[in-house]
Curated annotation (Swiss-Prot):
Pfam families: 7tm_1
Protein family per UniProt: Belongs to the G-protein coupled receptor 1 family.
Organism: Pan troglodytes (Chimpanzee)
Name recorded for this polypeptide: 5-hydroxytryptamine receptor 2C
Keyword GTP-binding listed: no
Chain segments carrying region Disordered: 274-301
PROSITE patterns for the chain: G_PROTEIN_RECEP_F1_1 (PS00237), G_PROTEIN_RECEP_F1_2 (PS50262)
Keyword vocabulary terms for this entry: Behavior, Cell membrane, Disulfide bond, G-protein coupled receptor, Membrane, Receptor, Signal, Transducer, Transmembrane, Transmembrane helix
Amino acid sequence: MVNLRNAVHSFLVHLIGLLVWQCDISVSPVAAIVTDIFNTSDGGRFKFPDGVQNWPALSIVVIIIMTIGGNILVIMAVSMEKKLHNATNYFLMSLAIADMLVGLLVMPLSLLAILYDYVWPLPRYLCPVWISLDVLFSTASIMHLCAISLDRYVAIRNPIEHSRFNSRTKAIMKIAIVWAISIGVSVPIPVIGLRDERKVFVNNTTCVLNDPNFVLIGSFVAFFIPLTIMVITYCLTIYVLRRQALMLLHGHTEEPPGLSLDFLKCCKRNTAEEENSANPNQDQNARRRKKKERRPRGTMQAINNERKASKVLGIVFFVFLIMWCPFFITNILSVLCEKSCNQKLMEKLLNVFVWIGYVCSGINPLVYTLFNKIYRRAFSNYLRCNYKVEKKPPVRQIPRVAATALSGRELNVNIYRHTNEPVIEKASDNEPGIEMQVENLELPVNPSSVVSERISSV
């Protein structure tokens, strides 16, 4: 209690000094608290060099807050919005958890190291733990993006096979595998660091991974290999989407073998259609023209939706690539050219590039906000403290008919304006399938006009 009281007193004193004597301050409030609580043996309180202020550190605090807050919004959106309940968004929520933990556990300690001029101010046993968390969450980010890329490619390439194994439980299992791989990559660091402090300290003061073999192997396993898989699968996904769109535009479709369910198709029945049935040539031409006109409608919309989703994910992939590649490339070069390279320059570059990678954790929520209406609307509601889930209007269901009673025959379900009750009639034998005829009850139309909906009987 005495140490805590002294720490609070020290914080208030230095905060007043920061507000009143900004130009003369020599100790930051955060540094004062840490020094008073831990009473480290590294010596005294931190002092900025002459002429240097702590405003860059304050800007980093803003980045940390935005990273934590933005990823919390993503987690809330996926948890509360039913439209976002799918495998890809579950992966994005898990990715947001990793990014949020970067803002909570990794970035503040890195900021603390900057305040102390990269002299580790905390107990030394915490250094390998902090490095392990850094590697864990960074690896989890790239593994999540790699898993998303693979999952979407399989879903677009083999939709039927993917739908059989695509459920919430399966998505959670895949996410668990991603986290298991990330933990497996990061666990050796505390073991190595606690056995030999030289593996995690440079010049016995700076907390940084100092094992060349682990740096090389870890960089390839945790970054370059998943990055290669991610780029290849994303390019293949774009190729498949373009090929499917071109085939639809030219009137060709790829139908998987076996049974398939047709989408609900609506058309108006008129007397001209019955007249054309008497002429086989005209009837055949009409069917071809009708089939060609209505084929792309639902499928093209699905492909457009996939393109939009792929565009958003592509931006996320590109941002991650641009912001983390400099760090890992410099990290590899610092090991390969240990003697020929300027190590001081390499250390300065790594200190800058690692923060560029950290900023990537806070950019993803901005990407979702700019390019996805559902996320944008959800974020807007949450920021206004509106957490109500939209309820869909009740849907009136038509009584179901047992499949065994159909036997390939057609049933006409007519809902008339004056009764609002369905009347089921058996149709003729020469028109197989199921036909539901529902009169429009809302719009002022001719009572004789009936909308016909045909569903394939499988």
